[in-house]
Amino acid sequence: MAVVLASPAAGGVAAGGFVVRNLDLFYGTHQALHQISMTIPERAVTAIIGPSGCGKSTFLRCLNRMNDLVPDARIQGHVSFRGQDLYAPGADPVEIRYRIGMIFQKPNPFPKSIYENVAFGPRINGYDGDLDEIVEGALRRAALWDEVKDRLRKPALTLSGGQQQRLCIARALAVNPEVLLMDEPTSALDPIATGKIEELMTSLKQEYTIVLVTHSMQQAARVSDYTAFFLDGRLVEMDRTERIFSTPSDRRTEDYITGRFG
């Protein structure tokens, strides 16, 4: 893995937790990402937008090495978080994924109780403290405690779709991550459940770095502090969200946001 360091991106983006430089990703002979360079600030919501197939989710998976699990995937370039090269020899992908959690498009609770879903991560990591405290704290941070506190031993699959997604967020929070990667976390949810997840993101960014892939321009505008526009596996531009949506630097960004394509 080549390590290529550079100064943070221009355009009002603060120095932050992730530094990505000259990132290429290949699936076999197909190149999915081309020379991505960006800085993702800590304790903010950064939205990744762009048309289907532009590389948004592929890029997101580079941030916690989920692409390692894809056959024939190959990566070149530099990805670091808080100064640690995530692809350095000896870097532990499992430890990285605990620090940098992932929330998927479709809620994926384990076929266990609500309690056991949240307790699972700390338990397999050998936590010997008060699991009840961990579970309650994670559920409170995920804004789910008041809805489930009287049925913690009930199957997680009895929850609504929106509740299941917040349970998955609580499960990620239970192992004390530093980052939440969210891959279209509300695309399968109704407007009310979507609103609760968006409120949760706004609350959680006080403690966590959040990177959000979304197809919804309205959602990106509502919840994100920074927005990056991807097209054909390339980063077109990244800036503060209000500037991206009001005065983007690139005509292609304006065309996408205004619905001329995508």
From Swiss-Prot:
The residues that the entry says bind ATP are 50-57
What Pfam families does the database record attribute to this sequence?
A: ABC_tran
Where does it primarily localize?
membrane
**GO MF term list:** ATP binding; ATP hydrolysis activity; ATPase-coupled phosphate ion transmembrane transporter activity
Catalysis performed (reactions): phosphate(out) + ATP + H2O = ADP + 2 phosphate(in) + H(+)
Q: How does it assemble?
A: The complex is composed of two ATP-binding proteins (PstB), two transmembrane proteins (PstC and PstA) and a solute-binding protein (PstS).
| Name of protein | Phosphate import ATP-binding protein PstB 2
Which species is the source of this protein? Symbiobacterium thermophilum (strain DSM 24528 / JCM 14929 / IAM 14863 / T)
What are the top taxonomic ranks of the organism? Bacteria, Bacillati, Bacillota, Clostridia, Eubacteriales
Gene it is expressed from: pstB2
